[in-house]
Amino acid sequence: MRNLKKKSRRGFTLIEVLIVVVILGILASTVLPQFAASTANAKESALRADLSQMRSQIGLYRFQHDGNLPSGTATNVANQLTMATDINGNAAQPGTAGYAYGPYLIGQLPANPYNGGNGILVKAANISSADVDPTAMQGTVKVGWIFSTVSGQIIANSLGNAASGPALSSL
């Protein structure tokens, strides 16, 4: 007599697959909004950290340069913050004789996390949220920051509100 073995079936039924898909859909609908909120909070935190760093370095520049702020064109201000400077604010490569101050920021200005720009718009006047234009360009560089050579104030060149409520340009 022949021995008949039952074939075992492997795999999942259609119902089992559908149940798993429904469960994954429910999980995704509850988890994805939390990731979106985390992204907004991370952008705000990055913006606050960048502004804090730049403000403290501008304060250090002012202290080391006898009360004078970075000044001149956008290129001059960026160079005064990212290169070595002399007491008069002239910029040169770090290590150049006679240029004992700075660099205050390593490399280049940080990118604004909301518009991606790392250029700086320099105003010889006080600045406010009315100066914000997130589409502003300086040649091929997007403007991420607005700086006043009068007050030393620096703000984000971003419209809208932070996740915590205040206007981005007022952080």
What are these regions (language model features)?
Residues G89, L109-P113, L159-A163:
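Acidic glycine-/aspartate-rich tracts in secreted/extracellular proteins
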Residues M1-F12:
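N-terminal leader/signal peptides at the extreme start of proteins
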Residues L24-N41, R62:
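C-terminal juxtamembrane segment of a hydrophobic transmembrane alpha-helix
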Residues A40-L51, G67-N68:
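Membrane-proximal amphipathic alpha-helices
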Residues A124-L171:
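Short, surface-exposed interaction loops/tails
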Residues F12-V21:
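N-terminal signal-anchor/signal peptide hydrophobic helix marking the start
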Residues M83-T96, I120-G139:
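Surface-exposed intrinsically disordered loops and tails
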Residues I58-I106:
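Short, glycine/small-hydrophobic-rich surface segments
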